[in-house]
């Protein structure tokens, strides 16, 4: 079982008592008590698991570069992290999720990441192929904590009460371009594909943001658990997502072909 450290896991060492991850990135400058990011290869895919509770993007950049250097022949480069930077849930997508967006989007783009698997929003979302816009954006460093965390209370209060700040914050997080809106099967696409999983256990669900974001190709909240099945071959990455209770697909199939 290869898991990412979640926001409810990061403040204690309990996670480390349950999981013995391969290739832990011990060079992180601001790790959380739960541990570090790590990486592993499976078949022709390289999986890089980020501890996104650490808001120091330089650590994640270094981990990605190290993983790629040690696995130069991996056909597929897949990042896994708990926080979603391109989701569609009401509680996180427009707050702590996008505080990481301006930092991680160009890093993923520069390192030719194919897919980013995310959670956190307790709702399902699938994006188009996205690239960095190549522009400089505010990283809102005043809300980062010394240990690599994020000051949610101060940020949330200002975001809620200060309309000018809220508008500026959202404008700075328009740090992406939609590279390809094709559906079904895309061949040698530009950009990165982001998938946000809903709860697989049904422990908690969040509403979707009322207005679907332009980067979202499909989304769902039926208030029931769902799961995704990913099939990776030499030349293809395919994802299908199903309702746990009924077994029915909640979204159309999406395939990336790399020749």
Identify the residue ranges that each predicted region occupies.
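Extended active-site neighborhood of metal-dependent phosphoesterases/phosphodiesterases
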Residues: 1-73, 77, 103, 129-218, ...
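Active-site glycine-centered loops adjacent to acidic/histidine catalytic or metal-binding residues
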Residues: 6-7, 82, 119-120
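Short active-site segment of divalent metal-dependent hydrolases/proteases
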Residues: 9, 85, 123
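Extracellular low-complexity, Gly/Ser/Thr-rich intrinsically disordered linkers
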Residues: 42-46, 81-85, 211-253
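Short acidic, glycine-rich surface-loop motifs adjacent to enzyme active sites
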Residues: 71-91
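Short, flexible/disordered intra-domain loops and linkers
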Residues: 90-98
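Catalytic-core regions built around general acid/base machinery
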Residues: 101-112
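Functionally important transmembrane alpha-helices
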Residues: 115-117, 223
């Amino acid at each position: 079982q290869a898991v990412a450290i979640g926001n409810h896991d990061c403040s204690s060492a309990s996670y480390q008592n349950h999981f013995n991850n391969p290739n832990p990135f011990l060079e992180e400058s601001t790790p959380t008590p739960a541990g570090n990011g790590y990486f592993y290869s499976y078949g022709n895919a390289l999986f890089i698991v980020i501890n996104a509770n650490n808001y120091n993007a330089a650590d994640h950049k270094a981990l990605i570069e190290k993983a790629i250097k040690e696995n130069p022949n991996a056909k597929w480069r897949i990042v896994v992290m708990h926080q979603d930077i391109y989701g569609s849930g009401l509680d996180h997508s427009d707050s702590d999720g996008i505080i990481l967006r301006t930092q991680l989007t160009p890093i993923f783009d520069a390192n030719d990441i194919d897919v980013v698997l995310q959670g956190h929003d307790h709702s399902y979302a699938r994006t188009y192929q996205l690239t960095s816009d190549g522009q400089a954006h505010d990283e809102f460093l005043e809300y980062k904590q010394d240990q690599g965390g994020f000051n949610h209370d101060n940020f949330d209060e200002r975001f809620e009460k200060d309309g000018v700040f809220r508008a500026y914050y959202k404008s700075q997080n328009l740090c992406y371009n939609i590279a390809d809106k094709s559906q079904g099967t895309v061949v040698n696409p530009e950009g990165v594909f982001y998938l946000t999983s809903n709860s697989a256990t049904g422990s908690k669900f969040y509403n979707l943001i009322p207005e679907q974001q332009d980067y979202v190709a499909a989304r769902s909240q039926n208030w029931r658990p769902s799961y995704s099945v990913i099939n990776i071959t030499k030349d293809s990455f395919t994802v299908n997502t199903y309702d746990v209770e009924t077994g029915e697909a909640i979204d159309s199939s999406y395939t990336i072909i790399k020749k």
